[in-house]
Amino acid sequence: MTGRQALSLGHKGARVTNSTANGVNAVVILVVEDELFLRVDITGCLREAGYVVVEAASGEEAMAVCQSNSSIDMVFTDITLMGSLNGWDVAERFRMQRPDAPVLYASADAIDRERCAPGSVFIAKPYRPDDILTACQGLRPR
């Protein structure tokens, strides 16, 4: 079965798009980005590549999505987010549920690279779609 289906998760702004390629379910990525235009670009790029994408516009929303969706395989999070939870908080809490799950951090501040947890990847803003796909493919869960 090939197709796409948008489902509401009951969280303001949260959305999951389910896409399948050749009958095989894709990796589910939670994208946490508070800047709408960046989030649209990131999720569009990942969806076109066949990933299943769950979106969140804040750290708090990301945590609510994680609690209601246990199928998330990896997280792509901006480090600087609006609200009380930043990208570090999102990754730490996500890894409490899924210790071996990969995390891709994004930031315009290169010094943030040094703080990334082992097994994570850092991508510097601004980035190109190819940078996103390369990073996600390198982190792809087993």
Where are these regions (language model features)?
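Non-catalytic signal-transmission and effector/linker regions of two-component phosphorelay proteins
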Residues: 1-30, 36-37, 100, 121-124, ...
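Acidic, metal-coordinating helix/loop segments flanking the phosphotransfer/catalytic sites
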Residues: 55-74
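Acidic catalytic/metal-coordinating carboxylates
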Residues: 58, 85-90
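Short loop/helix-cap segments at secondary-structure boundaries that form the rim of catalytic
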Residues: 69, 110-120
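Active-site residues of response regulator receiver
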Residues: 78-79
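Short amphipathic alpha-helix used as the core "switch/output" element in two-component signaling
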Residues: 88-99
